[in-house]
A protein has these predicted regions:
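Beta1/beta-strand and adjacent pyrophosphate-binding region of the FAD-binding site
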Residues: 2-14
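Conserved N-terminal helical subregion
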Residues: 2-5, 54-196
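Conserved FAD-binding catalytic core of PHBH/FMO-like flavoproteins
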Residues: 116, 130-134, 139-287, 291-297
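Glycine-rich FAD pyrophosphate-binding loop
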Residues: 23-46
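Conserved hydrophobic helix-helix packing surfaces used for dimerization/oligomerization
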Residues: 6-8, 29, 301
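Conserved mid-domain beta->alpha element of the FAD-binding
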Residues: 11-20, 24, 162, 197, ...
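Conserved Rossmann-like nucleotide-cofactor binding loop
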Residues: 14, 37, 167
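C-terminal helical "tail/cap" subdomain of flavin- and related membrane-associated enzymes
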Residues: 2, 331-456
Length: 456
């Protein structure tokens, strides 16, 4: 057993996975969480946004050896089912390759599986209802308040890692040292928020919509999406602006909400008899992006996951990026060693920040794509060409596929290469390029891919 004690703040998805991997390496791990043990309490409605598990996240689960267990809790989604306003629904495949899909999984179910795995390690101690109030960064000390007793406790570790989410207390302690650390921080909210509703199963426990698709009802400045759950239900999420006649701040009566759905989503009403009650009972959540740098302080303290790089959910990569943090951190321990935490932390932040900044930007891009463009003629033609190319030439990957199905390619390269590919494809779709055969088109795209592979 190694002597170093690792204190991890935040027993969410990435924090618990990190604790497991550090315990596997023989470290003493103390894992602190401000909430109750979710295995012993009922989860509140309206905050559960389903997660999309893809290969980057699966590689993280492999570290804990629980990929098979989690996949049993997943429903594969092979593409988007688009429901235009007043038009016929149509399907857009995520990939032209056989078997590629993203997986709808419950955040709570996944977190519980990770907590159960963590509990099996004698060298992991878990403390719930402990809120971090502040940290002494250079000493690896964190101060906690017990939410039920009010007692305070000081905890010292050889290193201190914050996986405590977008409102990270550890990050706030780093911000208090802005001048010393040259700490840069930005937080940008969309003018939209989200609210969750639900589609319940049929009386027989079946699905009312195609279960193997992510459903989107795009309506210009707002949209609804729905993801399947194992029990036959769908988690339905409204993404709306706060302001404007159909904004969350202005639809304040049952009559207004009912009239709005009758106008924009009449086909959903039969599936959701309680939608008005859910609209008023469930909270409205904000959608924001957090970027910061550096992620480490004094070689004793490190940020990881949403604490370092919270993103909006529109690429389905928030959890996957955080699990990738854990994987890269473990790979660096293998290559660099753990004798020099400061050097390890520095290399980790250098490798990860450029990539998490990229997926943050891509997630914003995808918000506008899902809301405004999924039923646009040029976009639909581009997607048709992409999936046809992927079917015929499996070595070609669209921007979406580079991000989602190629964990060997960093997010930054996927973003730059994918944008360059999109530019070429959209030019072809709009007639800005001479007509090409499929093989000529593939050859040009592969030349482009080679340039990015070589770092050009």
């Amino acid at each position: 057993m190694k002597k170093d004690k690792i204190v991890i703040i935040g027993a969410g998805l990435s924090g618990t996975l990190l604790a497991i991997t550090m315990a596997q390496r023989g470290y003493q791990v103390a894992l602190y969480e401000k909430r109750d043990d979710m295995r012993k309490v009922t989860m509140s409605a309206g905050r559960s946004i389903n997660l999309a598990l893809s290969p980057r996240g699966m590689l993280g689960l492999d570290l804990a050896g629980i990929r098979p267990e989690i996949l049993e809790q997943c429903i594969p989604m092979r593409g988007r089912m688009i429901h235009p306003h007043g038009g016929s629904s149509f399907f857009q495949s995520y990939s032209g390759r056989e078997g590629e899909a993203i997986n709808s999984v419950s955040r709570g179910g996944l977190n519980i599986a990770l907590l159960n795995k963590a509990e099996s390690f004698p060298n992991i101690e878990m403390y719930f209802n402990h809120t971090c109030t502040h940290a002494v960064l250079e000493k690896g000390i964190a101060h906690f308040k017990h939410e039920k007793t009010g007692f305070t406790v000081e905890v010292k570790g050889d290193i201190l890692i914050g996986t405590d989410g977008s409102g990270s207390a550890l990050r706030k302690s780093m911000m208090d040292k802005t001048a010393d650390l040259l700490f840069n921080y930005s937080q940008n909210f969309l003018s939209h928020g989200y609210k969750e509703l639900s589609i319940q199963p049929t009386a027989e426990g079946g699905f009312k919509l195609d279960k193997n698709a992510l459903h989107i009802w795009p309506r210009g400045s707002f949209m609804i999406i729905a993801l399947p759950n194992m029990d036959g239900s769908f988690t339905v999420t409204m993404f709306h602006p706060y302001e404007g006649p159909y904004g969350f701040n202005h639809m304040n009566s049952r009559e207004e909400v009912a009239a709005f759905f009758q106008n924009f989503y009449p086909e959903l009403i039969p599936y959701m008899p309680d939608y008005v009650d859910e609209y008023f009972n469930n909270p409205t959540g904000n959608l924001g992006t957090v970027k910061c740098y550096p992620w480490q302080a004094y070689g004793k303290t490190l940020l990881m996951g949403d604490a370092a790089h919270a993103i909006v959910p529109f690429y389905g990569q928030g959890m996957n990026a955080s699990f990738e943090d854990v994987r890269v951190f473990n790979e660096l321990i293998d290559t660099i060693g753990d004798g020099d935490w400061a050097g390890l932390f520095n290399e980790f932040q250098k490798q990860r920040a450029v990539n998490t900044n990229a997926i943050a930007d891509l997630a914003i891009d995808n918000f506008y794509e899902m809301r405004d463009r999924v039923d646009d003629a040029d976009f639909m033609l581009k997607r048709k060409i992409e999936t046809d190319l992927e079917f015929t030439y499996p070595d070609y990957y669209s921007k979406y596929s580079l991000v989602t199905f190629r964990p060997d390619i960093p997010y930054s390269r996927a973003m730059h290469q994918g944008r360059a590919q999109d530019e070429l494809l959209l030019n072809w779709c709009k007639g800005g390029q001479p007509e090409l055969t499929k093989s000529e088109m593939h050859a040009q795209l592969m030349d482009l891919s080679k340039k990015f592979e070589n770092g050009n």
